[in-house]
Amino acid sequence: MVEPPARLVAFGNQLVQVHIALRERVEELGDALNAPDLRDLRAHCLSFCAAVTRHHTAEDDGAFPVLAREHPELRPVLDELARDHVIVSDALDALTRLVGEAGDDEAARSALRTEVDSVAALLETHFTYEERKIAAALSALTGELGAADAELVARATAVPD
């Protein structure tokens, strides 16, 4: 039996690493609510939301089509994950709006904390499900995948800056 190259085997592990990095960033976002000035929160929120959006777009446009072709039995799961991405996107849009409109008082901070906690819970549920359902399939992709498809999957499993 020919073993797949280590680079491809790492895709499932890399997905988990991406999710760990995004979990840390949402935690930092919550911590930023304690800062005396919300300007840092606004900048961090924009950066965090952009990172999640880039990751999900890379999955939807790259990794998921490759997985669907290589593992057709995963199509229903991939469709469900893509629908989750829309829900997450809507939640991130709501958070971004709230951060942009928020005053610097306790009521605003409380509303922001509720929204950040909501986004964190949504992402945790999504990430856990995604890891359970597709990480092994990502790691099972073989060296026959081809450079273009491997690059698409690599983009979706790249840890955000």
Where are these regions (language model features)?
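Small-residue-biased structural context
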Residues: M1-D161
